[in-house]
Amino acid sequence: LACRSPALDLDGEFTPPETQHYPALPLEKLPELLSRTDNYSGRLLTRYALKLSLLFFVRSSELRFARWSEIDWQQKLWIIPEEREQIENVRFSHRGTKMKTQHIVPLSEQAMAILKQTEALSGHLAFIFPGEYDQDKCMSDNTINKALRVMGYDTRKEICSHGFRAMACSALSESGRWSKEAIEKQMSHQERNSVRAAYIHKAEYLEERIAMMQWWADYLDKNTERYVSPYQYAGYQREAS
């Protein structure tokens, strides 16, 4: 997963451990991606999964196996456990976070709205995104990528579901608004420096991450019609304030 911004002096500290590089669109293609997602004519739950996957930029299994019980509506948080309760006949449903520590995803107003729409369809079930043919199971691991292919993307060369993480990471970094610690924490990356890892593990940076996730959702909204760079958008906000 490549996540580097020339706008930042990272001093070798901003080093994601995920060495496999997944295809990701350049941020300039955001308006096209958002338009194609809005116009996706397949299953409605799949469209919601696409939208939330981009808003949350979590790993595929973290979203696929998500349960309604993990959503804290009052605090506007999605709390992903390090391990989930195994559901009978659902392979790997015990999987929680990849890093084996609880991960908090602050819910933007946009994410809350989509989750409410999703709840109307699957709120009576365990999984937020149930399978299309068996609602006791979760959506398949290929659902998002299949939808991207239907939307006209080559998931081997242009964009895959994991590529949303690189896009979000690039935008947050290039905006110049957020600390690398808060970005790393929200990306749920493993810090290689053991001393620094212990510090970051204790420091949640939650207040900054709440603001950051709302900024990301607002930034996506800003890009629905034409491309605005993260740095430009951050500048507009500074001028407005």
What is the predicted role of each segment?
Residues 48-51:
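Short amphipathic alpha helix immediately N-terminal
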Residues 19, 23, 87-116, 125-148, ...:
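C-terminal catalytic core of Y-nucleophile DNA break-rejoin enzymes
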Residues 8-45, 55-58, 66, 83, ...:
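Long, amphipathic, Lys/Arg-enriched alpha-helical "connector/arm" segment
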Residues 16-19, 24, 80-87, 112, ...:
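Catalytic-site neighborhood detector that most strongly recognizes the C-terminal catalytic loop/helix
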Residues 1-6, 53-79, 178-182:
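Short, charged phosphate-coordinating catalytic segments
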Residues 14-20, 110-146, 156, 197-201, ...:
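Major-groove DNA-contacting interfaces characterized by cationic-aromatic clusters
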Residues 6-17, 65-117, 191-194:
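Conserved tyrosine-mediated DNA breakage-rejoining catalytic core shared by Y-recombinases
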Residues 35-46, 105, 117-136, 142-185, ...:
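Short, basic (Lys/Arg/His-rich) helix/loop patches that form interaction surfaces
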